[in-house]
C-alpha cells in the first residue's frame, strides 16, 4: 500500500524508524497500489500485522476512520510480558481485540453477498489473512481464560471459532459441497506464544520441529496446510508432497483453466495433482530466515547456508555459540526431522 503524504512532508523508504514518518501521512487521501489495484473487487482489513501502525480499518482504498490519536496496545492481556505494540496513529474507537471478530464477521457477510451468484456457477474468492494468533495476543473478554493455559491458547481457541463461523456460513448458504477451503499459516509458531507454558500442559505447537518463527529451521517454515474440498479431496487423507504458499496461485489458475502469463507466478507450481492423489510437481523448496540466510530442500535433503539459526533461537547469528560450527548445515529430514544431526 502506498500512502499519500501531507503537502511539504517527506517519507523515505529507507527510514527504519516508523515514528519519524507515520504522522507525515495524509490518512484522509485514497491509498494507492492496495488490494483493489491488483485484482480484488473488495477489501476490508488492516494495513499490516496488528502490532504495526496505523491502527484503523481500511475499506477498499480508504481508512474507515481517521487515525487522529497516538496510542499503542498491550501485547498480551493481563500481562506486561511482551511489552506493547508500536505506538502510532490510531482511530479513536479502534480496539485491537475487535479485529479478529470484525474480520470474521465481514468474511461471513461477503460469503452471504456472493452466495446466490455462486450457486448460479459464478464462483467467488475470499482471502482472509487473520491478524491472530499473531501478537498482540488479545482475545476478547468472552474468550479470556477459556483454555485454562495462557492467553495465547485462549487466542488460538478464538481463532479456531472464527474459522468455524466461516465454515458454518458456507453450510448455511449451501456452498460447502462446492467450495475449496485452505487453512494455513505464513510462518511457524512464535516464541511470543510462551511455548514452555504450553508444553507444560501437553501442547507442543511445533511438535518435533526445531526452532520457530524467523529461523532457518523447520520450526520456522513447516506449517499446517489443511484442505477441505468435498468430492475432490478425500477427508482425513494426508500427503507428503512439498508445497510452498506461492503454489496457491498456480493451483487456483489450473482449477479455473486460466493460464498464467509468462511473467507471473514464476515460482508457483500447481499442487492440484497432489490434491487428487497423484504425484506432485514440486521436488524442491527454497526458504530463508529473518536475517537472509538461505536454505534449499530437495527430497529428504535440506542444506542451510549458515552455521546458526539465522533467526531468534540458539545458536543465534553472531553469538559465541556459533564458534567452531560448520559454515553450512546438511540434514536428512527423512531420518532427522528435528534437525539434530548436521551431516556436514
Q: What positions do the PLM features span?
A:
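Active-site His/acidic residue clusters
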Residues: 53-54, 58-62, 70, 107-154, ...
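Short glycine/proline-rich turn/loop motifs
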Residues: 81-92, 141-146, 228-232, 334-340
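Loop/turn elements at helix/coil->beta-strand transitions in domains of secreted/extracellular proteins
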Residues: 38-41, 119-126, 175-181, 222-223, ...
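C-terminal cap/loop subdomain of S1 sulfatases and analogous C-terminal strand-loop tails that border
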Residues: 18-50, 191-195, 199-216, 233-237, ...
Amino acid at each position: 500500500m502506498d500512502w499519500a503524504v501531507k503537502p511539504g512532508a517527506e517519507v523515505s523508504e529507507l527510514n527504519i524508524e516508523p515514528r519519524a514518518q507515520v504522522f507525515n501521512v495524509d490518512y484522509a487521501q485514497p491509498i494507492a497500489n492496495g488490494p483493489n489495484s491488483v485484482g480484488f473487487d473488495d477489501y476490508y482489513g488492516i494495513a499490516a500485522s496488528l502490532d504495526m501502525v496505523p491502527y484503523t480499518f481500511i475499506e477498499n482504498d480508504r481508512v474507515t476512520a481517521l487515525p487522529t490519536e497516538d496510542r499503542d496496545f498491550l501485547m498480551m492481556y493481563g500481562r506486561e510480558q511482551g511489552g506493547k505494540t508500536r505506538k502510532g496513529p490510531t482511530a479513536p474507537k479502534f480496539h485491537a481485540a475487535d479485529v479478529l471478530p470484525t474480520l470474521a464477521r465481514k468474511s461471513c457477510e461477503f460469503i452471504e453477498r456472493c452466495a446466490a451468484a455462486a450457486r448460479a456457477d459464478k464462483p467467488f474468492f475470499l482471502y482472509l489473512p487473520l491478524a491472530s494468533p499473531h501478537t498482540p495476543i488479545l482475545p476478547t473478554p468472552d474468550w479470556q481464560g477459556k483454555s485454562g493455559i495462557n492467553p495465547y491458547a485462549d487466542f488460538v481457541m478464538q481463532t479456531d471459532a472464527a474459522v468455524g463461523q466461516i465454515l458454518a456460513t458456507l453450510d448455511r448458504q449451501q456452498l460447502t459441497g462446492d467450495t475449496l477451503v485452505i487453512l494455513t499459516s505464513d510462518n511457524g509458531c512464535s516464541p511470543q506464544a510462551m511455548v514452555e507454558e504450553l508444553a507444560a500442559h501437553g501442547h507442543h505447537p511445533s511438535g518435533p520441529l526445531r526452532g520457530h518463527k524467523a529461523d532457518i529451521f523447520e520450526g520456522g517454515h513447516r506449517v499446517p496446510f489443511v484442505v477441505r474440498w468435498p468430492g475432490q479431496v478425500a477427508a482425513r487423507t494426508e500427503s507428503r508432497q512439498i508445497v510452498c504458499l506461492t503454489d496457491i496461485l498456480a493451483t487456483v489458475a489450473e482449477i479455473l483453466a486460466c493460464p498464467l502469463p509468462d511473467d507471473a507466478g514464476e515460482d508457483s507450481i500447481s499442487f492440484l495433482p497432489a490434491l487428487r492423489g497423484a504425484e506432485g510437481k514440486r521436488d524442491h523448496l527454497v526458504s530463508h530466515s529473518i536475517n537472509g540466510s538461505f536454505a534449499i530442500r530437495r527430497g529428504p535433503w535440506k542444506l542451510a547456508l549458515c552455521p546458526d539459526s539465522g533467526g531468534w533461537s540458539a545458536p543465534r547469528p553472531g553469538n559465541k555459540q556459533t564458534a567452531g560450527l560448520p559454515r553450512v548445515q546438511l540434514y536428512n529430514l527423512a531420518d532427522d526431522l528435528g534437525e539434530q544431526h548436521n551431516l556436514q
